[in-house]
């Protein structure tokens, strides 16, 4: 099979990369009704599989789970989760032939095997759903022409999909129809109903393409979302300890610092995150972020280039075929780092202390978010898609580090994200080695001393922060989410 994106001509590639439209709330007036009375069979019962299924059932849909025979016979975790939540469970042969919509929510590396197993069993005119388009775009999976292929991609981990639904809301979601597989022209109706059934329409839905979702998703997770957090954690910890900081304190400052810093990011973007600093610290964080952007720009561009060309995917799929040798080696090495093995700090660190003593971390977040966004947009991805795949998801990933350090992050994210994370972080750490030797007192681990600030310089820095394109689109999208949340609660 050929990489689907690489079979397109340049005009088609640009059109699909640039497909992105924020959908109006009234486009979802029919809710999930298009799928009511139809049989929806989910393949896979991991975090996305279970939680999307719970939401869809609560929205009135007929949901069951198709699992492999051995998973049922051995009563594996997927079987236990589905049965304990009261779902009907059966083999592919028992459930797929009756399905109107088959939703493939297994890990990326299993998609080809799953699709090849279920496709011959699917009835004529059925639909096949994904929550990530890797199998279609990068693997180039060929789907029967009578089958409609759609995607509903919540921009959050599966647990968040469920928790937001229970609160009467949802999570921002991308939907798409594969242009090669929409024989009856009903793909968008199916995708909209599925998104509504998960609650996504209450938080904002972008009509996108399989191509735009995959290329932007891969870029975000490799760079700012996972790779930058991992590289930053290792670099900052080693720097603090080398300067004489207690390893336990250093570990806590970093482990919980990302979450604290990005909570401000979630509420008010880079502007609010920077506003949490004193004026001297803000000026220093800005200067550091500009240095970091200049150093790291070629690395971000290389990752985007390799994603666009398919080089990244072919390398990762070669590792799949080699029993994940690289992935497992990198995972083991990460687990042995000084940051991961440091003792826990029993003392308390106040919220503002994370900002005051984490100026470098804030600079890394700012530089990474802006670089990821700028690099995606320069490659033809629309700003709204680039925002969701950079700034929006960062607090969610930072939260996983707060739970159990880098181990937890790498367990929670997909194997695809984990592989890309290691590629980036293994390149980024040595790239920033010299930069780390230029840090000043107050950049990390101690607060910057109060001092005189040049008004004109502060004015210009504030303007530069607020006028960045990601701040403009972020303010708009966060406003949509806030407005929709008010409507959802009122309703």
Curated annotation (Swiss-Prot):
<keyword id="KW-0028">Amino-acid biosynthesis</keyword>
<comment type="pathway">
    <text>Amino-acid biosynthesis; L-isoleucine biosynthesis; L-isoleucine from 2-oxobutanoate: step 2/4.</text>
</comment>
<dbReference type="InterPro" id="IPR013023">
    <property type="entry name" value="KARI"/>
</dbReference>
<feature type="domain" description="KARI C-terminal knotted 1">
    <location>
        <begin position="209"/>
        <end position="344"/>
    </location>
</feature>
<keyword id="KW-0521">NADP</keyword>
<keyword id="KW-0677">Repeat</keyword>
<dbReference type="GO" id="GO:0009099">
    <property type="term" value="P:L-valine biosynthetic process"/>
</dbReference>
<feature type="binding site">
    <location>
        <begin position="45"/>
        <end position="48"/>
    </location>
    <ligand>
        <name>NADP(+)</name>
    </ligand>
</feature>
<feature type="binding site">
    <location>
        <begin position="108"/>
        <end position="110"/>
    </location>
    <ligand>
        <name>NADP(+)</name>
    </ligand>
</feature>
<dbReference type="Pfam" id="PF07991">
    <property type="entry name" value="KARI_N"/>
</dbReference>
<keyword id="KW-0100">Branched-chain amino acid biosynthesis</keyword>
<keyword id="KW-0460">Magnesium</keyword>
<feature type="binding site">
    <location>
        <position position="68"/>
    </location>
    <ligand>
        <name>NADP(+)</name>
    </ligand>
</feature>
<dbReference type="InterPro" id="IPR008927">
    <property type="entry name" value="6-PGluconate_DH-like_C_sf"/>
</dbReference>
<feature type="binding site">
    <location>
        <position position="389"/>
    </location>
    <ligand>
        <name>Mg(2+) 2</name>
    </ligand>
</feature>
<dbReference type="GO" id="GO:0009097">
    <property type="term" value="P:isoleucine biosynthetic process"/>
</dbReference>
<feature type="active site">
    <location>
        <position position="132"/>
    </location>
</feature>
<feature type="binding site">
    <location>
        <position position="158"/>
    </location>
    <ligand>
        <name>NADP(+)</name>
    </ligand>
</feature>
<feature type="domain" description="KARI C-terminal knotted 2">
    <location>
        <begin position="345"/>
        <end position="484"/>
    </location>
</feature>
<keyword id="KW-0560">Oxidoreductase</keyword>
<dbReference type="Pfam" id="PF01450">
    <property type="entry name" value="KARI_C"/>
</dbReference>
<keyword id="KW-0479">Metal-binding</keyword>
<feature type="domain" description="KARI N-terminal Rossmann">
    <location>
        <begin position="15"/>
        <end position="208"/>
    </location>
</feature>
<comment type="pathway">
    <text>Amino-acid biosynthesis; L-valine biosynthesis; L-valine from pyruvate: step 2/4.</text>
</comment>
<feature type="binding site">
    <location>
        <position position="393"/>
    </location>
    <ligand>
        <name>Mg(2+) 2</name>
    </ligand>
</feature>
<dbReference type="InterPro" id="IPR013328">
    <property type="entry name" value="6PGD_dom2"/>
</dbReference>
<dbReference type="InterPro" id="IPR036291">
    <property type="entry name" value="NAD(P)-bd_dom_sf"/>
</dbReference>
<comment type="similarity">
    <text>Belongs to the ketol-acid reductoisomerase family.</text>
</comment>
<feature type="binding site">
    <location>
        <position position="78"/>
    </location>
    <ligand>
        <name>NADP(+)</name>
    </ligand>
</feature>
<protein>
    <recommendedName>
        <fullName>Ketol-acid reductoisomerase (NADP(+))</fullName>
        <ecNumber>1.1.1.86</ecNumber>
    </recommendedName>
</protein>
<feature type="binding site">
    <location>
        <position position="221"/>
    </location>
    <ligand>
        <name>Mg(2+) 1</name>
    </ligand>
</feature>
<feature type="binding site">
    <location>
        <position position="217"/>
    </location>
    <ligand>
        <name>Mg(2+) 1</name>
    </ligand>
</feature>
<feature type="binding site">
    <location>
        <position position="217"/>
    </location>
    <ligand>
        <name>Mg(2+) 2</name>
    </ligand>
</feature>
<feature type="binding site">
    <location>
        <position position="414"/>
    </location>
    <ligand>
        <name>substrate</name>
    </ligand>
</feature>
<dbReference type="GO" id="GO:0000287">
    <property type="term" value="F:magnesium ion binding"/>
</dbReference>
<dbReference type="GO" id="GO:0004455">
    <property type="term" value="F:ketol-acid reductoisomerase activity"/>
</dbReference>
<comment type="function">
    <text>Involved in the biosynthesis of branched-chain amino acids (BCAA). Catalyzes an alkyl-migration followed by a ketol-acid reduction of (S)-2-acetolactate (S2AL) to yield (R)-2,3-dihydroxy-isovalerate. In the isomerase reaction, S2AL is rearranged via a Mg-dependent methyl migration to produce 3-hydroxy-3-methyl-2-ketobutyrate (HMKB). In the reductase reaction, this 2-ketoacid undergoes a metal-dependent reduction by NADPH to yield (R)-2,3-dihydroxy-isovalerate.</text>
</comment>
<feature type="binding site">
    <location>
        <position position="76"/>
    </location>
    <ligand>
        <name>NADP(+)</name>
    </ligand>
</feature>
<dbReference type="InterPro" id="IPR000506">
    <property type="entry name" value="KARI_C"/>
</dbReference>
<dbReference type="InterPro" id="IPR013116">
    <property type="entry name" value="KARI_N"/>
</dbReference>
<dbReference type="GO" id="GO:0005829">
    <property type="term" value="C:cytosol"/>
</dbReference>
């Amino acid at each position: 099979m050929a990489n689907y994106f690489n079979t397109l001509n340049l005009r088609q590639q640009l059109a699909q990369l640039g497909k992105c439209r924020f959908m109006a709330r009234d486009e979802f007036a029919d809710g999930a009704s298009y799928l009511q009375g139809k049989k929806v069979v989910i393949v896979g019962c991991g975090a996305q599989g279970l939680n999307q299924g719970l939401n869809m059932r609560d929205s009135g849909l007929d949901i069951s789970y198709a699992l492999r025979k051995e998973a049922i016979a051995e009563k594996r975790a997927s079987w236990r989760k589905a049965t304990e939540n009261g779902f009907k469970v059966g083999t592919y042969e028992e459930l797929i032939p009756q399905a109107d919509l088959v939703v493939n929510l297994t890990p990326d590396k299993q998609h080809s095997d799953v699709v090849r197993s279920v496709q011959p069993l699917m009835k004529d005119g059925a639909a096949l759903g994904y929550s990530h388009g890797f199998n279609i775009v990068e693997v180039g999976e060929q789907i029967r022409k009578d089958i409609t292929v759609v995607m509903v991609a919540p921009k959050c981990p599966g647990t968040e999909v469920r928790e937001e639904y229970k609160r009467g809301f949802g999570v921002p979601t991308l939907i798409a129809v594969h242009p090669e597989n929409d024989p009856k022209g009903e793909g968008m109706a199916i995708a909209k109903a599925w998104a509504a059934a998960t609650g996504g329409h209450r938080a904002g839905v972008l009509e996108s393409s399989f191509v735009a979702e995959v290329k932007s998703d891969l870029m975000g997770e490799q760079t700012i979302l996972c790779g930058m957090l991992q590289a930053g954690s290792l670099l900052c910890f080693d720097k603090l300890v080398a300067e004489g900081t207690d390893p336990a304190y250093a570990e806590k400052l970093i482990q919980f610092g990302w979450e604290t810093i990005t909570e401000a990011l979630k509420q008010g973007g880079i502007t609010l995150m920077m506003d949490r600093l004193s004026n001297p610290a803000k000026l220093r964080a800005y200067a550091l972020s500009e240095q970091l952007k200049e150093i790291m720009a070629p690395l971000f561009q290389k990752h985007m280039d390799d994603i666009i060309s398919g080089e990244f995917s072919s390398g990762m799929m070669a590792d799949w075929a080699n029993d994940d040798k690289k992935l497992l080696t990198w995972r083991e090495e990460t687990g042995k780092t000084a940051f991961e093995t440091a003792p826990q700090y029993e003392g308390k660190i106040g919220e503002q202390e994370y900002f005051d003593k984490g100026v470098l971390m804030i600079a890394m977040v700012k530089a990474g978010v802006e670089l990821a966004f700028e690099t995606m947009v320069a490659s033809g991805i629309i700003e709204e898609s680039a925002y969701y795949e950079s700034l929006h998801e960062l607090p969610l990933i930072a939260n996983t580090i707060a739970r159990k350090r880098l181990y937890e992050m790498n367990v929670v994210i997909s194997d695809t994200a984990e592989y890309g994370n290691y590629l980036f972080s293994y390149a980024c750490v040595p790239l920033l080695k010299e930069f780390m030797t230029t840090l000043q007192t107050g950049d990390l681990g101690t607060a910057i001393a109060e001092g005189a600030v040049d008004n004109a310089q502060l004015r210009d820095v504030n303007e530069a922060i607020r006028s960045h394109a990601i701040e403009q689109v972020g303010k708009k999208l966060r406003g949509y989410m806030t407005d929709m949340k008010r409507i959802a609660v009122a309703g």
